[in-house]
């Protein structure tokens, strides 16, 4: 039976502070349109079927609340999630500083140091308002041991690639757990996107 005959479901959780564009990224990926207004999310779930590296996948994407008062609810979603998109806004130093808190929360809930995750600096179309450099994002991702990219939900820059990369991370870690073989160093590569618009397209491994 071919790979395409199997429909594997991937549970992906979007995490980050309020107003960083988590919902905008998710809706751009699922529905291909940009939501401009900010309406704080409590919890929204979306599903999308797509082919990633010649293998059909069903993505179950959970968009979570960034506000502190929903921390307990967020932990429940983290417990059930397989992979995580950890989002900050390049226009907000505070949202970047909050990222480590969310990362530590996932570590505590999952009770392990390593889990499938991608670090995302969103709103890279707002270069003039940048408060967090691309290098800072790369360095933080390196300390987490995860891929990194900068995205724009508004201009649909590297949105699909980000979600695909989380699925690849889940697959990679599953294979490592199954085989416990080499687990060698993955090499850095760049997400290709013709519309750079000053955004960092690096994916650090």
From Swiss-Prot:
Keyword terms, alphabetized:
Cell membrane, GTP-binding, Hydrolase, Lipoprotein, Membrane, Methylation, Nucleotide-binding, Prenylation
Top-rank lineage group of the source organism? Eukaryota
Q: Where does the signal sequence lie?
A: none
Give the lipid-moiety residues, type S-farnesyl cysteine.
202
Tell me which EC number(s) this protein carries.
3.6.5.2
InterPro entries from the xrefs? Answer: P-loop_NTPase (IPR027417), Small_GTP-bd (IPR005225), Small_GTPase (IPR001806), Small_GTPase_Ras-type (IPR020849)
Sequence motif Effector region, location on chain: 38-46
What does the record give as the reaction this protein catalyses?
GTP + H2O = GDP + phosphate + H(+)
Q: Which GO terms describe its molecular function?
A: G protein activity; GTP binding
Which ranges are cleaved off as propeptide? 203-205
How does its record describe regulation of its activity? Alternates between an inactive form bound to GDP and an active form bound to GTP. Activated by a guanine nucleotide-exchange factor (GEF) and inactivated by a GTPase-activating protein (GAP).
Residues given in the record as GTP binding sites: 16-23, 63-67, 122-125
One Pfam family recorded for the sequence: Ras
For this protein, the record's NCBIfam families field holds: small_GTP
State the protein's name. Answer: Ras-like protein 3
């Amino acid at each position: 039976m071919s790979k395409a005959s199997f429909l594997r479901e991937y549970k992906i959780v979007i995490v980050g502070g309020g107003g960083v564009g988590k919902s905008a990224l998710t809706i751009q990926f699922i529905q291909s349109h940009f939501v401009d207004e900010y309406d704080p999310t409590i919890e929204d779930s979306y599903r999308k079927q797509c082919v990633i590296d010649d293998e059909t996948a069903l993505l179950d994407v959970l968009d979570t609340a960034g506000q502190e008062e929903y921390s307990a609810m967020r932990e429940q979603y983290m417990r059930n999630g397989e992979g995580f998109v950890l989002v900050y806004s390049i226009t907000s130093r505070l949202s970047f500083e909050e990222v480590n808190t969310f990362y530590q929360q996932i570590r505590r809930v999952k009770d392990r140091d390593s889990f499938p995750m991608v670090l995302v600096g969103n709103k890279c179309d707002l270069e003039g308002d940048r408060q967090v450099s691309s290098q800072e994002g790369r360095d933080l991702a390196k300390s987490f041991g995860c891929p990194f990219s900068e995205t724009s939900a508004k201009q649909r820059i590297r949105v699909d690639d980000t979600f695909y990369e989380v699925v690849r991370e889940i697959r990679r870690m599953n294979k490592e757990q199954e085989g416990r073989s080499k687990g060698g160093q993955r090499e850095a590569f760049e997400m290709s996107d013709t519309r750079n618009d000053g955004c960092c397209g690096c994916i650090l491994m």
